From Swiss-Prot:
<dbReference type="Pfam" id="PF08474">
    <property type="entry name" value="MYT1"/>
</dbReference>
<feature type="compositionally biased region" description="Basic and acidic residues">
    <location>
        <begin position="225"/>
        <end position="243"/>
    </location>
</feature>
<comment type="similarity">
    <text>Belongs to the MYT1 family.</text>
</comment>
<feature type="binding site">
    <location>
        <position position="447"/>
    </location>
    <ligand>
        <name>Zn(2+) 2</name>
    </ligand>
</feature>
<feature type="binding site">
    <location>
        <position position="797"/>
    </location>
    <ligand>
        <name>Zn(2+) 3</name>
    </ligand>
</feature>
<dbReference type="GO" id="GO:0008270">
    <property type="term" value="F:zinc ion binding"/>
</dbReference>
<keyword id="KW-0805">Transcription regulation</keyword>
<dbReference type="GO" id="GO:0030154">
    <property type="term" value="P:cell differentiation"/>
</dbReference>
<feature type="region of interest" description="Disordered">
    <location>
        <begin position="479"/>
        <end position="499"/>
    </location>
</feature>
<feature type="binding site">
    <location>
        <position position="802"/>
    </location>
    <ligand>
        <name>Zn(2+) 3</name>
    </ligand>
</feature>
<feature type="region of interest" description="Disordered">
    <location>
        <begin position="208"/>
        <end position="334"/>
    </location>
</feature>
<feature type="compositionally biased region" description="Polar residues">
    <location>
        <begin position="634"/>
        <end position="646"/>
    </location>
</feature>
<feature type="zinc finger region" description="CCHHC-type 1">
    <location>
        <begin position="394"/>
        <end position="437"/>
    </location>
</feature>
<feature type="compositionally biased region" description="Basic and acidic residues">
    <location>
        <begin position="290"/>
        <end position="300"/>
    </location>
</feature>
<feature type="region of interest" description="Disordered">
    <location>
        <begin position="634"/>
        <end position="770"/>
    </location>
</feature>
<feature type="zinc finger region" description="CCHHC-type 3">
    <location>
        <begin position="788"/>
        <end position="831"/>
    </location>
</feature>
<dbReference type="InterPro" id="IPR002515">
    <property type="entry name" value="Znf_C2H2C"/>
</dbReference>
Length: 1122
């Protein structure tokens, strides 16, 4: 290839320098016999100019080189390489030197050189030529690849020192006998890689470390040379297509890990430092080299190839990979690829580690290598075939790789807008993931840190991430390594670069911003080997929280350490103090941590400092998580804030937290306030001159950062007291026990809280012995209603140990009932009912269960009581109660019923919810005397029923009622009927002699007498009226009977008249009166009237005609009988 084409690829190169072994020239002769090699040479000579213009994908080009490592021919040639002699290597080096001399511009290489290069460097040369990166690749490969390039330069020094130690190459040969042009070529390559990584950040590399390859050669052997070359060519052709698909999938994972690039500056500085050391070993590195790209193929290490081990973000394997065989590595690599979790980086590292092992074992003969090669070839070929079939681009499974969340199209993901991701990380629809898919990805897509379950990560509380970004365990290990470097500066000068490679940090993690909290000195921490650290981290982190197994066996006497409050000093300033055995301190700025072990016979520091350092560092970072459920055996800590102090908290046998204040008073000299160690039966007396750790003698160890600014090594010999920073403990012995541990606001006055605590502790001294841990006495309960200034402190859940979280009604501490409290159980309610007799439901036999307003026994009304409804009790005022409005008022003197919790009305007859009662209760508590509103009702009227003391009434046990309503004795007497009305009234007046001096009562009695008299008069009038009404009713009945008789008579007369009229009509039918028609029923009345007039006025009818008419009428009427 001409120089112009080479110069075009100058600024984009692979991250590894090619190493051409000493037998390169001899191998070229054997490569000419390979038909594929000859065909590639012919194609390459025709495509020299087009190749310089085309910009292929860097991943595809890198894969061509990558699988030279996995090919069996390359591995076999490396085994054969060490058998070649030093003299032959030096002779070959001279030939390489001649080939690598600078040529003039536009001068083509000789045909022999072109044949040699094209036969042996078919794919490497293509890669070097085609690595012009496209613009999208520039954004992807940036500072992360810069670190990899620097690490390669550092590791190149490891190989050189290994050769010197084994005797294969003398130091004089390394320093003096190297050709000047070859050494200048390597120096130029290293310098360009470092400079271009910093300036342009476009160093192109494969997905993992596949370009970190050995280009090895072997001596010309009569048996197997040509077949091995053919295998190498065929494997390269076969695996090239497979790895393209595989790399495309792994490219997606790199997108998730790009956010870690800017967090790896510390590691970059270390690698650059090692690179400078490597450059110092080359005295002639300043010589010019006009062809750096071409000379990159001719490295000045004739018999040793560069072995690279780079840990990436997806590497979860330890250094134990170097102990496995090549066959096992191939099997495990395929298994990892099928799971879709590990990329090619683990494969390359494992294979390189195995090759290092083979190179360092010169006792193995060439014949054994040939046998192993033939066996590995047969075993690896089926694996390659399976790889090809699995990652075939034409298969539908390849195209269907997308987010496993059902219904997710890739939008809204944290890692970007694309549907082809294969993990649950960053998916906004993770709540819709079925348990089967979640379980399938739980063991595959998780944090690569050994022992990490995903909890405590900075970015999220999930176990599906596949990077070490934000991993607290990895961060703890990084802190430990940095402490080791600063605490043991002498060991670093003695250790070789090989040991630095082995102890390379397993991850690039985020730096904890601890220095902002004050004077943080990491050189106090000890050195912890990574093997022990990983083992301890895995031991302490694999415990899962099973809510189903929440019982007294696991959580009994579990300790909680509240957060340490600040005092005179700044709350953010602290220093880390070392332990006596150089254990790593806890670097969390504001929290204390306790490690509880299940063993009760272990001493305070009975485990090694490595385990302690690993656990304390991991615990410190895990507690930085926003949501981290502590494990039951290793992280039994929980942070709680108090305004001025912290309380001693304990979990009893029932699994409930105990925040009561009436216990452990006599142990105040044993336990400091900042930590709870109540599971330990005995403790040493705390040192009173310094802040100390509370170390349990039997079950727990606790470390905590604090605000002290000075520390001595001998201060750690005894337990440390954190209770009184910068002052003596004897000054304030009463402040050990706070009022209650809650999330109260800092607005509460500290002095007022201390006074309340002291008052309460004085009242509770009589309740200390033989008490249930969750006791709530009347005094304790009524302290919830103290001053308005401490409103947020007092309005908390009355359940002992409840901080308000987990309630059905919400996560707040301001509720004042047990309703919805997850920690309130039946035994606790019964216990509270036993100690608060006046805070019960007034219904007889009601324990408070089944109420509409909640299942608790602290209610004091019949509202919602199911038993009150069943028994038919009425809570409405009766007639006698309504007569006197004074009976409907609050019994507390001076209360008008306003401001009551239960409502703004005056009809209640108890002190429940009365603000005046609460205020006087507070005054009584501050004065040292218990307050009871019943004492205000001893004077006054009592029940008027003889022998009744007020008990057993339906409306409550009160002495203030002045009526017979609800009195069981009065109702019993009324049912028997033994007391008449007059006797009852007389008894009423007799029992009212106590109130004779009351003018109001006298006036009422007088009015009652007047009413009685008027009632008597009205009753007499009513009797008279009733008699009159009776008389009138009798008269009315008589009249009605007479009317009936008359009606009957009238009816008989009408019948008779009808008969007469008919007879008259028949008789006078033939007689016609003048000027009248014959008689009929229609004119009967007129005919009768005319006849009557004729007989009345007979004088007018004296003429003969009229006389004859009258005679005829008389004759006709004679026959009619009336």
């Amino acid at each position: 290839m001409n120089v112009d084409n080479v110069n075009k690829g100058t600024h984009t190169r692979s991250k590894a320098s090619r190493v051409i072994p000493s037998d390169l020239i001899e191998q070229e002769v054997s490569l000419e016999s390979c038909p594929l090699s000859r065909k590639r040479k012919l194609q390459e000579s025709e495509q020299e100019n087009p190749l310089s213009k085309r910009k292929s994908h860097p991943l595809k080009l890198a894969l061509d080189e990558g699988f030279n490592v996995d090919s069996n021919g390359s591995e076999e040639t490396e085994m054969k390489e060490r058998d070649s002699g030093t003299e032959e290597s030096e002779a070959t080096l001279e030939e390489i030197e001649e080939d690598s001399e600078p040529t003039k511009p536009k001068e083509a290489p000789s045909p022999q050189t072109a044949e040699a290069e094209s036969s042996d460097k078919v794919e490497p040369e293509e890669t070097e030529t085609k690595t012009e990166s496209s613009p999208p690749a520039k954004a992807t490969y940036s500072s992360y690849h810069e670190i990899i390039a620097n690490s390669l330069l550092n590791l190149g020094q490891v190989a050189k020192e290994a050769l010197v130690s084994e005797g294969h190459l003398k130091e004089s040969e390394l320093n003096n006998e190297k050709p000047t042009s070859v050494k200048s070529g390597q120096a130029e390559i290293e310098q360009l890689m470092v400079e271009e990584a910093c300036e342009k950040e476009i160093i192109i590399q494969t997905e993992d470390a596949e370009e970190v390859i050995e280009v090895t050669s072997e001596p010309i052997s009569e048996s197997g040379t040509e077949p091995r070359d053919e295998v190498n060519c065929e494997d390269t052709e076969k695996l090239q297509k497979d790895m393209i698909d595989e790399e495309e999938e792994e490219e997606d994972d790199d997108v998730d890990e790009e956010d870690d690039d800017d967090l790896e500056e510390d590691e970059e500085e270390e690698e650059e430092h090692s690179s400078e050391m490597a450059n110092q070993d080359l005295p002639h590195a300043s010589q010019d080299s006009p062809k750096p790209h071409c000379e990159g193929h001719f490295s000045p290490k004739p018999e040793y190839s560069v072995i690279v081990e780079v840990r990436s973000d997806d590497d979860k394997d330890d250094d134990s990979h170097s102990q496995k065989s090549a066959v096992t590595d191939e099997s495990e690599m395929y298994d990892m690829m099928t799971r879709g979790n590990l990329g090619l980086l683990e494969q390359a590292i494992a294979l390189k580690a195995e090759q290092v092992k083979v190179v360092r074992e010169p006792s193995r003969s060439s014949l054994d290598n040939m046998k192993n090669f033939s066996a590995d070839e047969k075993q690896n070929r089926p694996i390659d075939t399976m790889r090809k079939s699995f990652y075939d681009a034409g298969r539908p499974e390849k195209r269907d790789i997308k987010c496993p969340t059902p219904g997710c199209d890739g939008t809204g993901h944290v890692t970007g807008l694309y549907p082809h991701h294969r993990s649950l990380s960053g998916c906004p629809h993770k709540d819709r993931i079925p348990p089967e898919i979640l379980a399938m990805h739980e063991n595959v897509l998780k944090c690569p840190t050994p022992g990490c379950t995903g909890q405590g990560h900075v970015n999220s509380n999930r176990n599906t991430h596949r990077s070490l970004s934000g991993c607290p365990i990895a961060a703890a290990e990084k802190l430990t390594r940095s402490h080791e470097k600063q605490q043991q500066p002498g060991d670093l000068s003695k250790s070789s670069s090989n040991s630095d490679r082995i102890l390379r940090p397993m991850c690039f993690v985020k730096q904890l911003e601890i220095p902002q909290y004050g004077s943080y000195r990491p050189n106090m921490a000890p050195a912890t080997p990574r093997a022990n650290l990983a083992k301890e981290l895995e031991k302490y982190s694999k415990v899962t929280f099973d809510y189903a197994s929440f019982d007294a066996q696991v959580f009994g006497k579990r300790l909680l350490a509240p957060k340490i409050p600040s005092s005179e000093t700044s709350p953010k300033a602290f220093k880390s103090k070392p332990f006596p055995k150089a254990s790593s301190p806890c670097h969390s700025p504001s929290s204390s941590y306790i490690k509880s072990t299940s063993s009760s016979s272990s001493s305070g520091f009975d485990y090694t400092h490595d385990a302690e350092a690993a656990h304390m560092a991991a615990t410190a970072i895990l507690n930085l998580s926003t949501r981290c459920w502590e494990m039951p055996e290793n992280l039994s800590t929980k942070q709680q804030d108090t305004p001025s102090k912290s309380s001693e908290i304990e979990v009893d046998e029932n699994g409930t937290l105990d925040l009561s204040m009436n216990k452990h008073r006599k142990r105040e000299s044993t336990f400091p306030s900042s930590s709870s160690c109540s599971s330990s039966p005995s403790m040493k007396s705390p040192d009173q001159s310094q802040r100390q750790n509370c170390t349990s003698a039997t079950s727990s160890n606790m470390t905590s950062p604090h605000s002290s600014q000075t520390s001595r090594q001998d201060d750690w010999d005894g337990p440390i007291d954190y209770t009184k920073p910068n002052r003596q403990r004897e000054e304030e012995p009463e402040e050990m026990e706070p009022a209650a541990a809650s999330f109260a606001s800092s607005e509460v006055d500290e002095q007022e809280m201390q006074e309340m605590q002291e008052m309460q502790e004085m009242q509770e001294e009589s309740y200390e012995d033989r008490k249930y841990p969750g006791d709530v006495t009347l005094t304790n309960f009524k302290l919830k209603f103290l001053s308005k200034d401490s409103k947020k402190e007092l309005l908390s859940c009355p359940t002992p140990g409840c901080d308000g979280s987990g309630h059905i009604t919400g996560n707040y501490a301001s509720h004042r009932s047990l309703s919805g409290c997850p920690l309130a159980d039946k035994s606790l309610r019964n216990l509270m009912a036993a100690h608060s007799a006046d805070l019960k439901c007034p219904t007889p036999g009601c324990d408070g269960s089944g109420h509409i307003t909640g299942n608790y026994a602290s209610h004091r009304s019949l509202s919602g009581c199911p038993r009150a409804k069943k028994s038919g009790l009425k809570i409405t005022p009766t007639k006698d109660d309504k007569d006197d409005p004074d009976l409907m008022k609050c019994p507390v003197p001076g209360c008008d019923g306003l401001g009551h919790i239960s409502g703004k009305y005056a009809s209640h007859r108890s002190a429940s919810g009365c603000p005046l009662a609460a205020r006087r209760q507070k005054e009584g508590a501050l004065n040292g005397s218990a307050f009871s509103w019943k004492s205000l009702k001893t004077e006054g009227p009592s029940c008027p029923t003889p022998g009744c003391d007020g008990s057993g009434h339906a409306n409550g046990s009160f002495l203030t009622h002045r009526s017979l309503s609800g009195c069981p004795r009065a109702s019993f007497a009324g049912k028997k009927g033994k007391i008449s009305g007059d006797e009852l009234l007389g008894t009423n007046f007799k029992t009212s002699d106590v109130l004779e001096n009351d003018e109001e009562i006298k006036q009422l009695n007088k009015e009652i007498n007047e009413l009685n008299e008027s009632n008597s008069e009205m009753e007499a009038d009513m009797v008279n009226l009733q008699s009159q009404i009776t008389t009138m009713e009798k008269n009315l009945k008589n009249i009605e009977e007479e009317n009936k008789v008359i009606e009957e008579q009238n009816e008989a007369l009408f019948v008779e008249l009808s008969g007469l009229s008919q007879a008259l009509i028949r008789s006078l039918t033939n007689i016609r009166l003048p000027q009248m028609e014959p008689i009929s029923e229609q004119n009967f009345d007129a005919y009768v009237n005319t006849l009557t007039d004729m007989y009345t006025n007979q004088e007018c009818y004296q003429n003969p005609e009229n006389k004859a008419l009258l005679e005829s009428i008389k004759q006709a009427v004679k026959g009619i009988k009336v």
